[in-house]
Amino acid sequence: MRRKNGLVFLAILAAMILAFTIVLPTDKGALLGKGILFGLDLKGGLHMVYQADLSNVDESNIDGVMDGVVEVISNRINPLGVTEASIQRQGDDRIVVELPGLDITDEQKARIGRTALLEFGELAADGEDYKWENSLGKWKPATATIDGVEYTLTSAYFKDSTYVNRDQYGNILLVFEWDDIGAQLSKEITTRLLNQQLGIFEGDEALSGDNGIPIAPVINNVIETSGVIEGLSYNEAEMLSNQLNAGRLPVPLEPIYEQTVSPTLGQNFVDLAVKAGLVGIILVMIFMIAFYRLPGLLASIALVFYGVIVLALFKLVPVTLTLAGIGGFIVSAGMAVDANILIFARLKEELLTGKTLGAAVEAGFSRAWSAIWDSNVTTFIACGILFWVGGTIAAGAPVKGFAVTLFLGVAVSMFTAIFVTRTLLRLFVGTKTGKKLALFTTQTRGKNE
């Protein structure tokens, strides 16, 4: 048993070291070196306004269309609600997007307003009407008739499962799958266009590869259920895949305004919050060590482990910390301390009844577990409700951010309280230190608490 506990301890130590290597680097050139992200209220960011082209939208449908635009943009840049991006309507035809951080790339900006609707075209015959023209010729939409209705082949008939892959030669592939209507259209069109080119367009432009040449593959066989698009760079294919899966914009967007936003709280607040947090943690550790002796010291070590793991997760997800997110982290830290106090109170009771340390540790954790589980499951349910509510309101990003940070923190706190602290205590079972009651409680046997 002691050998097993020793191996578990080494695994915990290795996890601690790994978490430190993730948390500590802030140099962007280092592995995982990007610092923890801060929200618009703490670090500033970018304020952008987009104008929607509603010229082809019936007036009675404007609200539904604009709500759809907000949803698609939110899914593109804020799928988990942890980047704290704000997407809101302004008037009838404008969308305001606020992105935290001052290092937003042009690619990230382009991701927001991109329509993400691919249209497939066939070469137009001389004298025929055409929609696109490029170096390969003039193109008209590729269409087919199903049950008397004419359809145009577009990515609107893709299933939401496109992904990026590589072929055996390492070439980038954007893999897609047709839905039922798309499969019928693709079968009819590719049967008709065997040994001819099929153009791919986005908006008014042809989809082009790294070399700038329009992508227009020759149809070598009938394509029915799925297909691939070759010639894109990895970044372009990945961005397009994400946007296709998130959904296409129902109307075109035009950027009309962009401004850098200063933080509302700023670095001074961050510095004060860090100092206050460190003072609070030190005071909690002093209390636990004074009241629970050795278990309190071990819990303090587990609390440090908890903090490092949570911060590592914040970087890996990544979570953008705002005032709301910091609040979720603090609440989860309090719950981590609360779990340890419940365990140690039970442990002390068991020791005072005359049990050995090993028996007291197992009994203490067993008796405290139901209370810890109930309180944490209740918190998880509350997080789920908050996450859902945050997704139904325009300014819900902070609510979703609070829910996610609280969920991550509480999940890690359960792990550290039940697994890490327990393993550290088990290391003392059967040792001389483990037989010294004074190291585990300020009371003596025979006295009631």
Swiss-Prot record:
Output one GO MF annotation. Answer: protein-transporting ATPase activity
SUPFAM superfamilies per the record? Multidrug efflux transporter AcrB transmembrane domain
Chain ranges passing through the membrane: 6-26, 272-292, 294-314, 317-337, 379-399, 401-421
Signal peptide (residue range): none
Q: Where this protein primarily resides, as one coarse class?
A: membrane
Which domain of life does the UniProt lineage start with? Bacteria
Q: Which GO terms describe its cellular component?
A: plasma membrane
Q: Which UniProt keywords apply?
A: Cell membrane, Membrane, Protein transport, Translocation, Transmembrane, Transmembrane helix, Transport
Q: How does it sit in the membrane?
A: Multi-pass membrane protein
InterPro entries from the xrefs?
Acrflvin-R, SecD, SecD/SecF_arch_bac, SecD_1st, SecD_SecF_C, SecD_SecF_C_bact, SecDF_P1_head
Fetch the PANTHER family from UniProt. PROTEIN TRANSLOCASE SUBUNIT SECD, PROTEIN-EXPORT MEMBRANE PROTEIN SEC
Q: What does this protein do?
A: Part of the Sec protein translocase complex. Interacts with the SecYEG preprotein conducting channel. SecDF uses the proton motive force (PMF) to complete protein translocation after the ATP-dependent function of SecA.
Q: Which family does it belong to?
A: Belongs to the SecD/SecF family. SecD subfamily.
Q: How does it assemble?
A: Forms a complex with SecF. Part of the essential Sec protein translocation apparatus which comprises SecA, SecYEG and auxiliary proteins SecDF. Other proteins may also be involved.
Q: What is this protein called?
A: Protein translocase subunit SecD
Q: Which gene encodes it?
A: secD
